[in-house]
Amino acid sequence: MSYTLFISDLHLDESRPQHLAALEHLMKEHGGVADALYILGDLFETWIGDDNDSAFNLRAISAFKRFSSTGSKLFFMHGNRDFLLGGDFAQQAGGTLIAEGTVVNLYGIQALLMHGDSLCTEDEKYQQFRAMVRQPAWQQGMLTKSLAERRAIADGMRMQSQQNNENKAANIMDVTPEEVVRVMEEAGVNDLIHGHTHRPNVHSVQLADRMGTRWVLGDWGNSAWLIRASKDDIELTNFDIA
């Protein structure tokens, strides 16, 4: 049976090799069987540029290349941690970068794909940060710096983000319901798949003249979350990470 997989928020990092091992296992199991694998942002804890050819990054790229060489398609979307993923990375991995807000046909169902951070409109401080780092001029300026400088800046941003989040109300860091309705109506879809919030769940959404569904992927911690879509259904599931 044809099916497509979605994952997000793996936050791959050298300090957590078990997550990369779990991803390698997932891709080995489904490579050549699944129609496609979509990674909806925050694949890496940080990505400071495609020229950062560490052994860990090269291992991840090799795993993606093995998967894509089986004939299964591979798609990457930027998240709030890995917005510097570029064309060189995608080419080496054998995948394709897709934009936030891409609509795909899942066996007759039109689904809107997002990382999910743009849906958290009440977190105004974060949205200002997002607008800054998504500017091509800012990214180009970042990439002209040395790897050591970029790493230091990324570490500083991560620490600042953690400190900011400690003082935020939980609802501010979740999606804004009105924004969810707006983007789904604008895209003309009944289904939205996203990550970012680390709150895996399936939500019913009241649209103007119909009910929709919001599918939320979880982050990879002690378990790995994924969505499997086929012509029969869409399922949110998880498996333990050793």
Language model: regions and residue ranges:
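Core catalytic region of metal-dependent phosphoesterases/phosphodiesterases
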Residues: 2-3, 12-106
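Divalent metal-coordination and catalytic microenvironments
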Residues: 9, 37, 42, 64, ...
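Short histidine/acidic/glycine/proline-rich micro-motifs that form metal-
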Residues: 10-13, 119
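A structural signal for the main folded, soluble domain(s) of proteins
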Residues: 24, 240-242
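Conserved beta-sheet core of the metallophosphoesterase superfamily
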Residues: 92-99, 112, 117, 123-128, ...
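A short acidic, often aromatic-flanked loop/helix-cap motif at beta-alpha or helix-coil junctions
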Residues: 103-106, 222, 242
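Active-site-proximal loop/helix segment associated with metal-binding centers of metalloenzymes
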Residues: 114-175
